Amino acid sequence: MHKILKPVFILFLTLTTQISPFLGNLNLHAQSKDSIILAGGCFWCVEADFEKVNGVSEVISGYTGGFVENPTYKQVVKGGTGHYEAVIIHFDPEIITTKNILYKFFRSIDPTDAGGQFCDRGHSYKSAIFAKPNQILIAKNALLEAEAILGEKIVTPILEVSEFFTAEKYHQDYYKGENLVLTRFGPIKQKNAYKRYRSACGRDERLKEVWGKDAFLN
């Protein structure tokens, strides 16, 4: 019995030794994740912009910055909750850094607009960066860089990160949704309704005016 078990045990040790570094690399990669919360007007648009970025694993639409627990979309857009429409971006910092994300973020919004973003007006549509302690300096530097390039005062605030409430399922991945929605053009798919909304809102046109060729367009 021992003569049979010994070779098996040696084989087990050999395999374990060979596999351990591989498992270690997997664990290291699994830990190489970060996130940042950004408000840039309509969260459908911000989600669409950043889900195409290499290194970003997920973008979730939601609400943050307010004082109402578990707010609904209707409550937030009506006002009085203190919340912003925002997204939380999950990314791999070994592929894309916080600095790179903020570079793209500023070029995907009009950071000189204090009343909202594009055709969407009011507090819930204002832009903001909700920074974790280790992201504050990076955000400040990104803001100063954007301000120097535009030659105008940036009004996008850098705020302390606060609880993020995930928006209703209806709003997630709206820009590529296949469900039918009723519009003034009749029932159309969400993804087509999104394209019409974005175009009518003038988002990309305004970005070109503000940022020129550096605009981060969908």
Outline where the language-model segments fall.
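Positively charged n-region of N-terminal signal peptides that target proteins for export
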Residues: 1-7
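Bacterial N-terminal signal peptides
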Residues: 7-25
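Flexible coil/turn and secondary-structure edge motifs
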Residues: 21-218
